[in-house]
Design a protein with these regions (language model features):
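Rossmann-like AdoMet
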Residues: 6, 16-160, 164-177, 208-209, ...
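A short SAM/SAH-binding and catalytic strip from SAM-dependent methyltransferases
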Residues: 162-163, 175-199
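A short, conserved alpha-helix within the catalytic core of class I
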Residues: 167-168, 194-206
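Conserved beta-strand signature within the Rossmann-like core of class I S-adenosyl-L-methionine
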Residues: 185, 211-221
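Short strand-turn motif at the edge of the Rossmann-like AdoMet-binding core
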Residues: 191, 220-223
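Short, glycine-/aromatic-enriched active-site segment of Class I SAM-dependent methyltransferases
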Residues: 224-240
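Short alpha-helix
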Residues: 241-264
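Core SAM-dependent methyltransferase catalytic element
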Residues: 271-296
């Protein structure tokens, strides 16, 4: 694969399974994720903090500027709000699966403003002793998180750049609740489409190299069939540049790790809690998957 088209270390063929649309029946799965910081400095590692996507995510803490940009984004692609919400629902299902499999430590990278259910709520529903670290750079994110988490043991917020895995895993706030020598679930939900392919590969490879065997990697990434549509959305969305990664590139972000079934698929068809997908056709997708680091 040519440099810039994906991770050069990945030799596996794409296993993207297309699918239909589902409505997740689980309560409280309205999305908060819209993306994250990419290859230039922005206010937060999670691009939802730009106007527009915060509103499309169904958040209550949006502002007038959010409504204006949200309207413009919807004019370009009316189904964008569906993608944001489907992404969030996938994250909750994937975290639930990891907790079901015995993972008790979670790191949410580019966490964004708190949502309900949050990662710690989803994990603790299955694993009451789960410990969670939220990582971001935006002061508003950190202040919100610390205020909400002040009375919760085993949950913390750390100010760190997700693109520096060693700094993240060594952050004193994170180390107060997370032991990287034990299996950890890393959540990279809707952040890697704000990086070019090489940068995204470097980020995921960095975490994989530092994680204990038996750890999990959760990735979701927006992708559009029409490159021009992606360019229009990127031009309108001010906090970061969107990179339109096709399925084979998104799969390469896993660095050759074996994906849990059903492999790389659309978010709404990854182990849906509603048995029968409702078929639909659209240009935008959230590609999603979960991989496990093999035992030593």
């Amino acid at each position: 694969m040519a440099r810039g088209a994906g991770c050069s270390t990945s030799t596996r063929s794409p296993r993207w399974h297309g699918g239909g649309c589902v409505q997740d029946p689980a309560p409280g799965v309205a999305a908060r994720r819209g993306g994250a910081r990419g290859d230039r400095r922005i206010r937060s590692q999670h691009a939802e903090h730009g106007p527009g996507l915060r509103l499309l995510a169904g958040r209550k803490d949006h502002y007038a500027a959010d409504r204006a940009e949200g309207d413009r984004l919807l004019e370009i692609y009316p189904q964008l709000a569906d993608l944001v919400q489907e992404n969030r629902a996938f994250i909750i299902r994937a975290v639930t699966m990891a907790a079901d499999l015995g993972i008790s430590q979670f790191i949410d990278l580019g966490a964004g403003l708190p949502a309900s259910p949050a990662v710690h709520q989803a994990a603790r529903k299955v694993m009451p002793e789960a410990r969670v670290a939220y990582v971001d750079t935006a002061p508003v994110v950190l202040s919100h998180a610390r205020a909400l988490l002040a009375t919760r043991d085993g949950v913390t917020a750390a100010e760190a750049d997700l693109r520096d895995p060693a700094a993240v895993l060594g952050h004193p706030h994170l180390r107060a609740v997370i032991d990287p020598a034990r299996p950890v679930c890393i959540v990279l939900g809707a952040v890697l489409h704000f990086m070019d392919a090489d940068a995204a590969c470097a980020v995921t490879a960095g975490y994989v190299s530092l994680l204990a065997p038996g750890s999990y990697l959760i990735i979701s990434c927006a992708s559009f069939d029409d490159p021009e549509l992606a360019k229009q959305l990127s031009a309108e969305y001010t906090p970061a540049t969107w990179h339109n990664h096709p399925a084979e590139v998104v799969e390469s972000f896993f660095g050759g790790l074996e994906l849990a079934g059903p492999g790389l698929t659309e978010a709404q068809t990854w182990r849906p809690w509603l048995a029968e997908p409702v078929p639909c056709h659209r240009d935008g997708h959230v590609l999603a998957g979960v991989a496990r680091l093999g035992d030593a």
